[in-house]
Every structure is written in structure tokens, then in C-alpha cells.
A protein has these predicted regions:
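Short, cysteine/histidine-rich loop/knuckle motifs that typically chelate Zn2+
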Residues: 9-12
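A short secondary-structure junction motif
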Residues: 31, 35-38, 68-72
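Detector for the c-type heme attachment site
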Residues: 14-20, 33-34
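Electrostatic cytochrome c docking/interface patches
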Residues: 1-7
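Short, flexible micro-motifs
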Residues: 6, 28, 36, 77, ...
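Short cysteine/histidine-rich zinc-coordinating motifs and their immediately flanking basic loops
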Residues: 22-27
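Flexible coil segments in periplasmic/lumen-exposed cytochrome c-class electron-transfer proteins
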Residues: 42-59, 63-66, 70-146
């Protein structure tokens, strides 16, 4: 599948086999729904503990794979990220398949909300009725029209 093909770049640091050894990065078998620093025998940086949500939910994997160092400042993962949503979705789907009991898939609404959150900010005005000029910093992450 596409996700498995894309994940070959990850194999330099991660293993994907059930019971597989950790490498430079932790083994990723069963990662979806697992505690963020839950791979025994791997020395994590601590950046993921500081992030909040204790488990690797779909939304967290999507954000982390988009920009790992933005999601978890101080992470040891030296990967710039995957810009294309379809690449992230393929990897996450592949990771989901690496389980004896895969986590249920997200709903279409959850997917749409996450894509809107990660979309680049709009650079032009939103056509607000406010007569005063507002700066781009006044817009929220959810204001997109792409």
C-alpha cells in the first residue's frame, strides 16, 4: 500500500515489526492509540510528555507527521515532516494496520476539522464587516477558504 511505500524513508530509524527492536527511533508496531512514550526500552526526549494528550490519536499523528519539531519542540526526531495531507493519511493508515486490534477510523467531520486546522493561513482579508483594518495576526487557525 501507499503508506508502506512512504514509510520506507522512516525505516532508517524505525522498525515496524511486531516485537521489533528499537532503532534510532522507537518501533512503530501498534503505535496508533498507544501511549506517546510507551515503547519500552526506548529513551525518549521528554518532548512528547510535555505536549499533553498521552496517546497517539489520529489527530496527534497527523500533526506530528506534518511538522514534528513544531508539534513537540525538543523532539529528537530529525524529520522535516510531510506537507501533503494524503501522504500523512497514507502513513497513518499504514501505522493503523500494524496492530492486532486496530483503532477505529476517525469520522469525516474529524478529518475535515483537522485539515482546516493545518491549512496555511489566508493572506487576504476575509471580507469582515469591521470598517477598521485588522492584521493577519487577528485571524484564527480555523479561518480558511481553500
Amino acid at each position: 500500500a501507499r503508506g508502506q511505500k512512504i514509510s520506507k524513508a522512516c525505516a532508517a530509524c524505525h522498525s515496524f515489526d511486531k516485537g521489533g527492536a528499537n532503532g534510532v527511533g522507537p518501533n512503530l508496531w501498534g503505535i496508533v492509540g498507544k501511549a506517546k512514550q510507551g515503547q519500552s526500552g526506548y529513551n525518549y526526549s521528554g518532548a512528547l510528555i510535555a505536549h499533553g494528550n498521552p496517546k497517539w490519536e489520529y489527530i496527534d499523528l497527523n500533526e506530528y507527521l506534518y511538522k514534528p519539531k513544531k508539534y513537540a519542540p525538543g523532539t529528537n526526531m530529525n524529520f522535516i515532516g510531510l506537507k501533503k495531507p494524503e501522504d500523512r493519511a497514507a502513513i497513518v493508515a499504514y501505522l493503523r494496520s500494524l496492530s492486532d486490534s486496530p483503532v477505529p477510523l476517525p469520522t469525516d467531520a474529524q478529518i475535515a476539522a483537522e485539515e482546516a486546522k493545518l491549512a496555511p493561513p489566508e493572506t487576504e482579508g476575509e471580507g469582515e464587516e469591521n470598517s477598521e483594518e485588522t492584521s493577519n495576526s487577528d485571524t484564527t487557525d480555523t479561518e480558511t477558504s481553500e
